[in-house]
Amino acid sequence: MTSELDIFVGNTTLIDEDVYRLWLDGYSVTDAVALRVRSGILEQTGATAAVLQSDTMDHYRTFHMLERLLHAPPKLLHQLIFQIPPSRQALLIERYYAFDEAFVREVLGKKLSKGTKKDLDDISTKTGITLKSCRRQFDNFKRVFKVVEEMRGSLVDNIQQHFLLSDRLARDYAAIVFFANNRFETGKKKLQYLSFGDFAFCAELMIQNWTLGAVDSQMDDMDMDLDKEFLQDLKELKVLVADKDLLDLHKSLVCTALRGKLGVFSEMEANFKNLSRGLVNVAAKLTHNKDVRDLFVDLVEKFVEPCRSDHWPLSDVRFFLNQYSASVHSLDGFRHQALWDRYMGTLRGCLLRLYHD
């Protein structure tokens, strides 16, 4: 009589999250071992220093072999060499593509080229992030940009599909790609108070409203490129400040609506025309690439700084922008309402986000 025996062999790849973090942060094996010793792991586990060294080296070898798969995350899902549960695969991918706020602020809006990569030594010194980690993050930005730059469809969806990132991280990468493509200036001294989150918020609004994809979901590069026709049309808004009667009527409508509601009413009334000229002239200049790049510099100079110097609270800024935008619909001589709404709807959201200390 013969009996059959089924044998199952498991070789699940073990991933130590703490060691993975040390590897991602760019620490050498020696430094990683020292940090693990400092954490008290030898006392907790009863292991020897030699075992800890061997364990760390084994993990580093595994991560090094996984790295080429992490460059194209769908490959990690479909390979058979490493037996890694789906939840662990998602963690590996998400953390590999995560980035440091201090690092992204240094490269946001810059061309993702060799020229910028040469600056990584200085960025590493300035931020305290290891050079190896800076390189990984920069290469990730560049890799995502290269994959999605020629694709049709939603930028966020394309990033999620090809890199399997969470919705939040995919949206952050969409902002990075959008800023790199349009080369927005973010490094000037007067912009240093702004966080990556501030810029990412504005990028999302612009992608939704000012790109080719905002008006035609079948357009090539729809979420990467600003709608040039829209930018050209914005010159039509100049009539709001060039026509004295329209400017006076606009001011009158806003002041009538806000009298008694703003703590800074007298400051607003005195500065209305300067603020309006600033906002409208920003729009009219967006036909030039340099002025597109300087958008955030102009918004801070023309609106944020004047209001801040007069000590406007955020609530008053919100009241003003809402009424300033809405009152244009009551100007009988103005015929570009849809264009105005497309411009100010996005600009209002951006300005409210940019208005803080």
From Swiss-Prot:
Bilayer topology annotation: Peripheral membrane protein
Sites bearing N-acetylthreonine, chain numbering: 2
Gene Ontology terms, MF aspect: fibroblast growth factor binding
Presence of keyword Membrane: yes
Any GO CC annotation of this UniProt entry: endomembrane system
GO biological process terms, semicolon-separated: platelet aggregation
Localization: Nucleus; Endomembrane system
Alphabetical keyword list: Acetylation, Membrane, Nucleus
Cytoplasm listed as a keyword: no
InterPro entries: FIBP
Pfam families per the UniProt record, alphabetical: FIBP
Chief place where the protein resides: nucleus
Subunit composition and interactions: Binds to internalized FGF1; this interaction is increased in the presence of CSNKB, suggesting a possible cooperative interaction between CSNKB and FIBP in binding to FGF1.
Functional summary from the UniProt entry: May be involved in mitogenic function of FGF1. May mediate with IER2 FGF-signaling in the establishment of laterality in the embryo.
Protein name as annotated: Acidic fibroblast growth factor intracellular-binding protein
Record organism: Chlorocebus aethiops (Green monkey)
Lineage: Eukaryota, Metazoa, Chordata, Craniata, Vertebrata
